[in-house]
Every structure is written in C-alpha cells, then in structure tokens.
Amino acid sequence: MLNAGASAVHPRPVQRPPLQVFVAGTFDGLHYGHLFLLRYARRAGLAMARRLRRPGVRLSVVIARDDSVQRIKVRPPHHTQRERQQLVAALRLVDRAFVGQRDDFIKSVRRAQPDLIVLGYDQSAAWEEVLRSAGVQARVVRCQEYRGRRLKSSMIRGDLERMRT
C-alpha cells in the first residue's frame, strides 16, 4: 500500500538504438560523387528510421584495404588505407569509418550490424546475392548516379592526365 506522499513507479520507455547504415568503398581520391553517396545513405537511413520510429541514424563506412584495391582495380591505391580511412572519418556525415577485414567483406558487414546497406551505383549487383547467401538481414538499396552521370575517381584521374599532355 502506497502512502499519500509516494508516487507510483512508472517504468521508463525502452530507448531504441539509432538505425545502423552501412556503406563500403575504396574512397581513393575523395570527390563529390562520394559525398553524394554518403548524403544519400544518411537520407535513406533517416527515412527508414522515421518509419521504424528509431531515434536517428549512425552511418558506418568501411574502407577497402590496400590489397583489395590492388586486386579489384589492378593498380595500387593513391592513398593508403589509413589515409583514406582518416579522410572519410573527418566528414561530418560519417559517424564511424574503419578499414575492412582482410579477404572477408561479410565480417566487416557483421561488425557494423547494419539495418540498411547502401551500395554505390557502380558496385557489383553480385554483392546483393553475397549478402543474402551469408544471411545478412539488412535492407539493401542502391544509390543512383550523381545527376544522372557517372562520376568516378578513375575518370577524374583520366581527365587530369589529358590536361597535362
């Protein structure tokens, strides 16, 4: 029995965690297309968070390892994985940037525990199947090209080379 001066105990509502958004990439020669992708990821995450009544988003970005860049792009990166990680981490849009696991993309995904994975327009469609077959439950969306045109670091480097000659 409560005395007249005591107040009833009200349980605190359970605070849900922010929505986890995940982006992966090389980010070698950071440019506006990268910024467009990260802004798109945050906006898509905020829209999903509102629908799910989650208190905002946390954007995690995994940076490709130097050996992965060499294997995929058949050239060494211009910036080291540490430099690329620091550049991306310095962006206000990004809550966390880390270098990916050696030879295991799925470990990097699991480390981030994403609710939403945003792929760039130029990332392989095979990643969606790889994620599904690994049992990743996150929703996967693809960012469109910036202003309907392809913007890639390799294109920028090519333009700079042509300007030098």
Question: What is each residue range found by the language model?
Answer:
Residues 1-165:
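Nucleotidyltransferase catalytic core that binds NTPs
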